[in-house]
Amino acid sequence: MDSREDMVPDVLLEAPNPRRRQSADTSTERPTRPARREQGYARVTPRGERMGNHKARVAKPDFFAWFDPRWLWVPLMVCLAVGGYWAYEPLEKLLERPFKSVVVEGEFHFITKARATELISDEIDNNFLQLDLMRLKRTLTDDPWVDSVSLQRRWPDTLVVKIAEQKPIARWGDGFLNQRGQIVRVKEIDRLSGLPWLQGNESDAVEILQQYQDLSQLLRSRGLDVIALKCDNKKSWRLTLKNDVEIAIGRDKVMEKMRRFVTVYDTHLNSVWIDIAAIDVRYSNGLAVRWVEGSESAKKYLRAAAATTNATRNAPTHP
């Protein structure tokens, strides 16, 4: 056995070099990348401020900090007072300027323009300040033929008076009904001679006017003009046409009955209309005709009725 001991080679131990270790660590680690910013979001610093060039904000001195806008009222009121004082006298002279002309406008059928001018001249003073416009309007509208009045001042010295007359639709008692169904009393009733005559209770005036307009529209296309319409206390209707033919309608279904009459008129009555004196449409499924006495249609009807009666009498009877 060899007495020689095993020889262990020397091992060189070196102290760790911090630079080398740092280099090794750096080579193995992946570089850190900044977080990706989504579109639409601004990059901010940890303090919450935007990145970029910042300019220091320098507070500007406020030279108007002492100013209070309410102070403007003082010089404004002073200016208005001074201006009003100097303008009062010229304005007063302008307002007191006397009229040089009065213009009367409107369509005149029942009241003459001369009559309107006369009513106006009685109310006009020498200047605008003393003119009572409301009293002038009342004076004009008190005339039953005047519906409305409009007054306008046309500077510097002209008064424009616009007058709208009443529009009579039908006669009613000692006056007429206007387009609103109002009863207007007038003295010159003869000036309404060409209008239809409506009769009934005053409380039913609007309804009667509406019924007249509906019936007139239905009959006018066939040359049948309504000259009178009456509604009695039982609300029974009766009308008179231009050739003095009276039609008894009754209390209910007025338009339905008259439409049935129009149908019969178109098919049977049109050709013998001059021989008809009266018609009764109060039946549920027809109408009755009263002929003018002695007319050809009346004679023909009487002959036909007599023949029918004789045929009935001579007909054989069966046991």
From Swiss-Prot:
Region of interest: Disordered: 1-53
Biased composition annotated in UniProt, kind: Basic and acidic residues: 27-52
UniProt keyword Manganese present: no
Stretches assigned to the POTRA domain: 97-166
Subcellular location as annotated: Cell inner membrane
InterPro entries the record matches: Cell_div_FtsQ/DivIB_C (IPR005548), FtsQ (IPR026579), FtsQ_C_sf (IPR045335), POTRA (IPR034746), POTRA_FtsQ_type (IPR013685)
GO annotations of cellular component type: cell division site; plasma membrane
Residue intervals on the Periplasmic side: 88-319
Highest taxon listed in the record's lineage: Bacteria
Topology of this chain in the membrane: Single-pass type II membrane protein
Keywords from the named record: Cell cycle, Cell division, Cell inner membrane, Cell membrane, Membrane, Transmembrane, Transmembrane helix
Topological domain ranges for the Cytoplasmic compartment: 1-70
The protein, known as: Cell division protein FtsQ
Provenance organism: Cellvibrio japonicus (strain Ueda107)
Gene symbol of the encoding locus: ftsQ
